[in-house]
UniProtKB/Swiss-Prot annotation:
Cellular-component GO terms for this entry: small ribosomal subunit
Species classification: Bacteria, Bacillati, Mycoplasmatota, Mycoplasmoidales, Mycoplasmoidaceae
Protein name as it appears in the record: Small ribosomal subunit protein uS10
A molecular function (GO) term: tRNA binding
Keyword terms: Ribonucleoprotein, Ribosomal protein
């Protein structure tokens, strides 16, 4: 494709259950983006989604005995400004670890 094609703004939304893994992925993306000379806004922390699950410990009676588990989904938003096709190609080459979800939007 033509490398002169530009997108005025490209939003990357990252989600993960592990915040350290999410931060390492963000560092990789920032290094690649700075190497291609693309302006970057962020990473902006978004609200963490907290999901609490309560189960009864006993299989029979004793409903007062319960156990709670929680699952936190950490989210970040990065906005890339004036992205060309070469920048998008370099973003596609990044190895994203298992457990991190990326979503791109204009």
């Amino acid at each position: 494709m033509n490398s002169a094609v530009k997108y005025p703004e490209l939003k990357i939304k990252l989600e993960s259950y592990d915040s350290t893994l999410l931060d390492l992925t963000i560092k990789k993306i920032v290094e690649v983006v700075k190497g291609v000379n693309i302006k970057i806004k962020g990473p902006l922390p978004l609200p963490t989604k907290k999901e609490v699950i309560t189960i009864i410990r006993s299989p029979h009676v004793d409903k007062a005995s319960r156990e709670q588990f929680e699952k936190n989904t950490h989210k970040r938003l990065m906005i890339l400004v004036d992205v060309n096709q070469g920048g998008i190609d370099s973003l596609k080459k990044i190895k994203i670890p298992v457990g991190v979800t990326l979503r791109f939007s204009k």
